[in-house]
């Protein structure tokens, strides 16, 4: 791990520099992992872990937050076409309420890595987005704003975002009044107003501000919570 520290101090613009450097240090399978869904009032937190082929056009993969929906979907499809290895981890709103959103996010990434390992080889090194390492016995480094520093993390952020958006789109068909198809569970004005009018669903995070205030009210209304 000491050999990695110099790599982090002077990262070039190349967003596959870390992956190549780690491979040169003897880590043959490098995965990036990221999660989506820490801020919403409803729905799960979903993480992805991705191993990119060494010969792919890694510059295409950028932080999902700066890409359009159309571009994210295109890149998600591209990942399947270039035979990238992908793992998905999902932690429900119920578990989020039980263990808090930070621990749920780390758990989702752990599950994504385990899913990745079950579909292909176990990674030898992890590039993790954020400040905290994943609770799993693998060599790893946590990178703040990792999506801008690693193509593998960026690819994972795209997969997680598209996967979660599709989940919330399906949820919208059950509860159209909350606008999950456009807000993905985030606390938009329309979403907050719908909670006030209709109460909460079983998919809302009861420990979150903006939801917990309506738990008893929803029960009194006979709400879906």
Swiss-Prot record:
Any one GO molecular function term: RNA-DNA hybrid ribonuclease activity
Localization, UniProt: Cytoplasm
Any one of the GO BP annotations: DNA replication, removal of RNA primer
Gene3D superfamilies found in the cross-reference section: Ribonuclease H-like superfamily/Ribonuclease H
UniProt-annotated binding residues for a divalent metal cation: 34-35, 129
Family: Belongs to the RNase HII family.
Function statement: Endonuclease that specifically degrades the RNA of RNA-DNA hybrids.
Domain RNase H type-2: 28-220
UniProt xrefs under SUPFAM superfamilies: Ribonuclease H-like
Obligatory cofactor(s): Mn(2+); Mg(2+)
Keyword Metal-binding: yes
Keyword Nuclease belongs to the record: yes
Native source species: Desulfotalea psychrophila (strain LSv54 / DSM 12343)
Organism domain of life: Bacteria
Protein known as: Ribonuclease HII
